[in-house]
UniProtKB/Swiss-Prot annotation:
Belongs to the PMP-22/EMP/MP20 family. This is Lens fiber membrane intrinsic protein. Present in the thicker 16-17 nm junctions of mammalian lens fiber cells, where it may contribute to cell junctional organization. Acts as a receptor for calmodulin. May play an important role in both lens development and cataractogenesis. Keywords: Cataract, Disease variant, Disulfide bond, Eye lens protein, Glycoprotein, Membrane, Phosphoprotein, Transmembrane, Transmembrane helix. The modification Phosphoserine is found at S170. GO terms for biological process: cell-cell junction assembly; lens development in camera-type eye. It comes from Homo sapiens (Human). It is found in: Membrane. It comes from the Eukaryota. It holds the Pfam family PMP22_Claudin. The gene is LIM2. Residues 1-3, 88-98, 162-173 are cytoplasmic. The chain crosses the membrane at residues 4-24, 67-87, 99-119, 141-161.
Amino acid sequence: MYSFMGGGLFCAWVGTILLVVAMATDHWMQYRLSGSFAHQGLWRYCLGNKCYLQTDSIAYWNATRAFMILSALCAISGIIMGIMAFAHQPTFSRISRPFSAGIMFFSSTLFVVLALAIYTGVTVSFLGRRFGDWRFSWSYILGWVAVLMTFFAGIFYMCAYRVHECRRLSTPR
């Protein structure tokens, strides 16, 4: 059980760090505009060497930002639940802590997939046509790696829950 929780905590830490880095950086998309290099993220865009805040309140920007923030919050709360499960803190005695941590990581995975799907759909259908020479960049890719890490953290915690439940049911009372 502890090896599953240790693997879950490792994946959770890495996934959460990747989520925060992907959300905070401005290299989701790179393109050429009027012959100069430009890139943009969720919060700002840069033309040449000068960066500007994204002040437009466009629905897909707001949805992507909101889902990324929700994903990071779920991942952080999953880490807290995972640490409590690892340390056997008796805070929630009626609720399985590994199961709760697994659910939080699966929720985090769902939210980041929704954010990346919205961003991908709008970028490919609208912005991709607007800018001829464009590509997704490393911040966007970190978001997809964070999907894998939070998903595997959820898998590890569900396995830890299953091992714990099998041991609990097999011991005589």
